[in-house]
Amino acid sequence: MAKQKKQPRPKAETPKGFRDYFGAEVVERQTMLRKIGEVYHRYGFDPLETSAVETVEALGKFLPDVDRPNEGVFAFQEDGGSDDGKWLALRYDMTAPLARVAAQFRERPLPGQEDSLPSPYRRYTMGPVWRNEKPGPGRFRQFYQCDADTVGAPSVAADAEICAMLADCLEAVGIERGDYVVRVNNRKVLNGVMEVAGLAGDDKEAARGIVLRAIDKMDRLGAGGVRDLLGDGRKDESGDFTKGAGISSANADKILAFVQATAGDNAATVSNLKSLTEGSDIGTQGVSELEQIASLLAAQGYGPDRIIIDPSVVRGLGYYTGPVYEAELTFDVQNEKGQTVQFGSVAGGGRYDDLVKRFTGQEVPATGVSIGVDRLLAALHATGKLKGEDAGPVIVTVMDRDRMAEYQAMVATLRNAGIRAEVYLGNPKNFGNQLKYADKRRSPVAIIQGSDEAARGVVQLKDLILGAKLAEDATLEEWKSQPAQTEVAVADLVAEVQAIIARHK
């Protein structure tokens, strides 16, 4: 009988483009999502959880052009790959599932309920999304999105509300006023400016695309570089040539004037935009919407120190149909090359009035925002407000195996007082290993009670944080005056542990 071939052991590794999150990283994200969710909830938005898997047909953007979805999504076929099996895919954003839900339950009762979705429908959602794209530094195939959208509200009051809510979210997670700004623009205004500049009509679609990409590079290339891209084109430092939009110098002036129309306050900016869109109905409509948004925000106390009309915001204008907004953090950080740069964008959104049209054939107005959770966490780390460290539990050490019930009673007392605590459950034979474990867990306090201490009704409290500091740089006199280990009565255990934890916060 042939000897059965031994199967190789699986390799323990994370798939390419994915990563694991431990301890403090998970706690920090959970805390941030909770704070943002509280703001969304306060504004009257309801939470929604959808399946991680959608039909490729519902995703829309990745419909197969041959016999399977394109490579941008993680997709698989039902029924073992049979020809009539539906293609399914992991969601690539939170908007596609919202479109499906809004269409599916527009008139149909919600599961287990009698009513269908209200209109307008206000929802927020948080969770991972997946994109089958080439990974890179800081770019993963799974990441978190945190969205809020209003479906069925045509008024720009819904857009103004999203902007106000976005500002409140940033402050709720610890971004101070003055360190951020929410910038607002409108696709209709840009359409109007392009119309005035002779770029209307289907035959100018390619040129409009070049204009959009050009003005998005304003920060990097400056007005001169953008002007080149609006004209014949531009040669970069490497000698590569980028073809331009081919518009006249006079019309390029109009585009640049639009991008640079931001003035000292929102009213002055609106005035500049009115003159630039004169003669264009769509442009005039867009300026009027921006004026309404600024007025609605001012009535709620959101001035230009927090939210401004800024025509230089063009990212996403190719997708949105009306107002578009972007939250930018304005403080400086060091980039990977050691250069001082502004932190930049952490959230964006806008109005998209064709959300459920693919499903119903009818236009349904919608507006929303998506907050980049990982970017926002990185910003808080950059400002020192998050340290990437999570305080570990208090460790009750085990001096006598036969007294485990007493140690468990002790840890229960701590937990009942709201203190995170655990009993050491490894091999207690080597006490030094218990303290090493406590250090590795970043524990603030180790509790020690042998039979002698138990007989006297006391415990030893070892302040591990103070002990580490003293071991690092304390003089002999400081070490003697600040003992890292003290003896306290069992009756005072909770109060003394709370005092040590509070001292190191």
Swiss-Prot record:
Molecular functions per Gene Ontology: ATP binding; histidine-tRNA ligase activity
Name assigned to this protein: Histidine--tRNA ligase
HAMAP family the UniProt entry points to: His_tRNA_synth
Source taxon at top rank: Bacteria
Keywords, alphabetical: Aminoacyl-tRNA synthetase, ATP-binding, Cytoplasm, Ligase, Nucleotide-binding, Protein biosynthesis
A Pfam family hit: HGTP_anticodon
CDD domains: HisRS-like_core (cd00773), HisRS_anticodon (cd00859)
